[in-house]
Every structure is written in C-alpha cells, then in structure tokens.
A protein has these predicted regions:
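N-terminal active-site segment of His-dependent metallophosphoesterases
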Residues: 1-60
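Surface-exposed cleft-lining segments at the edges of enzyme active sites
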Residues: 14-18, 50-53, 117-127, 153-162
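Extended active-site neighborhood of metal-dependent phosphoesterases/phosphodiesterases
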Residues: 59-136, 170-180, 194-197, 209, ...
Length: 264
C-alpha cells in the first residue's frame, strides 16, 4: 500500500502567479503527472489547496485545483488548511455541507485518519473535542497513520512556530496508548520532523515554495512577513505500508542529475 502525500499547493486562478513567482496551476499539473508515473494507491492532500479562499472568493482557485486533480489515477483525500474554507473545498470536490472535513478508513490493516485542523480566522490550527471524536472512535490495538494540515506542536521553526496550535494536549491524550506510527502534516513549508507525544510529527515539503528553516520569529520580521522563500524541485512524500511496517520516503520528481553508475 503506497500513500502519496502532497501539501500546500496554494492554487490561484489559472495563469495567476503565487507571490509573483510560482505558477500553481502549472506546478500542480507537473505534480499530478509525477504522481501518475509513481502510481500510488491513494493520494492525500494535507491542505492549503487554495491560496486565499480565506480572504476572497476562492471558487476560481478551487475550480482550477479540482480540474487538475481530476487527472489523478489514484483516489484522492483532501484536508483543509488555514487558507481554505470548508464550504469552498467541499463544493469543489464533492463534499458539500458545513461539517468538518476529516476522514477515517482502513487500508490493508492500517487505519488512516485525517483530522480537520482549520479554525477560520487563525493561521494556527485547532482541534476541538468534536473533531477528535473521529480518532477516538478508532478501535485500539492497530496501527494508525494520522494526516492533518497543522503540526500539533512547535517544529523548531521560529517564524511558523509563532502561530500556535490549539488542542495539542488533547490530541496527545487521544493518541496515548495507541500505535500511532506518524502524524503527517504540511503548513510549515519545510521538510522537518519532531518526536512528540510518543510518535513522530512530520511536515512534508510544500508544492508551492519552501520557507528557510532559520527565519526569525513573526514579531522580529519586517512587516510581520518572512524575508523570502525558495522555489525548489518538486518533492512527494511516500508512505509505504507492507502490512507490518511503515516506510517513509521523500522523492524528488524533477530536475535531478543522474543516476550515475558507480565506478568499478
């Protein structure tokens, strides 16, 4: 069972650049082509599908994202990020309603749980008692892989850690005594991991751009903005489950040299 994770596509209207540099539609199209070459059994998008649905009409952004993602050969699961809206995401991807957009399903003995951490008006995420019911309903005793947009703890990134997560202690209690193999996140625009609450919290690299890991804290940044971002070759996080062990790989899917043969 191979589960591919993508995150933070920050879709704009077709032809519109993100931060004047990145074409999200073209980037997502390349990402879909790469995913179809890899052939995962499932794709999970861990949020910020749109770039500014939280501040303006996100329908054009979601329409572009839905059109491109419809080209995926594998089934798709989506979670909202802080730049998304539940209504917009649900309408574009066939999940109408005002409820939380989580999921819980079994795949070859591995329980996959997607938690909705969106809290409108907040950059940081939140898990409330209602959202945690999805996880608490999972029978104990089997392995669990959790997906969510926001990491539930500081990740050692001064800028992004300045937007705190609400509900981390409750999540830690909910996973206590469970075999939670990993909490797979996005949000921070960096490839970074941290041991927390007896498991590993892992943020995947963004599909749009990366933030330097040593950016100063929000309060110390001019105008409250990071000094800059980098546009890097696309990477995809792969979670491979063989029925007993989870192996996680980050693969670069474009602009690499080689492979070169080893000299004799």
């Amino acid at each position: 069972m191979r589960i591919a994770q993508i995150t933070d596509t920050h879709m704009r209207a077709r032809g519109e650049l993100w931060k004047g540099r990145v074409d999200p539609a073209a980037t997502l199209a390349r990402l879909v082509a790469a995913l179809n070459r890899i052939g995962p059994d499932l794709v999970v998008h861990t949020g910020d599908v749109a770039d500014s649905a939280d501040r303006e009409d996100g329908a054009p952004q979601y329409a572009v994202a839905a059109d491109i993602l419809s080209g995926l050969k594998a089934p798709l699961r989506l979670l909202p990020g802080n730049h998304d809206t539940r209504a917009g995401l649900g309408a574009a991807f066939g999940r109408p309603g005002d409820g939380f957009l989580g999921f819980s399903e079994e795949a070859r003995g591995l329980r996959l749980v997607g938690l909705d951490t969106l809290e409108p008006g907040r950059t940081g995420g939140r898990l409330c008692a209602d959202r945690l019911k999805l996880l608490e309903a999972v029978p104990r005793g089997g392995p669990v892989l959790i997906f969510m947009h926001h990491p539930p703890c500081p990740m050692g990134l001064p800028f992004m850690d300045g937007f705190p997560f609400e509900g981390g202690a409750a999540l830690a209690r909910a996973i206590a005594g469970r075999e939670v193999l990993r909490i797979a996140c996005g949000h921070v625009h960096a490839d970074v991991e941290r041991h927390w609450a007896g498991t590993l919290v892992s943020a995947a690299p963004a599909a749009s751009a990366q933030l330097p890991v040593d950016l100063p804290a929000f309060a110390e940044s001019p105008r409250g903005l990071p000094a800059g971002f980098t546009v890097e070759p696309l990477r995809i996080r792969l979670h491979d489950w063989d029925g007993a062990t989870l192996t996680v790989k980050t693969v670069m899917v474009e602009a690499v040299e080689g492979p070169y043969p080893f000299p004799p």
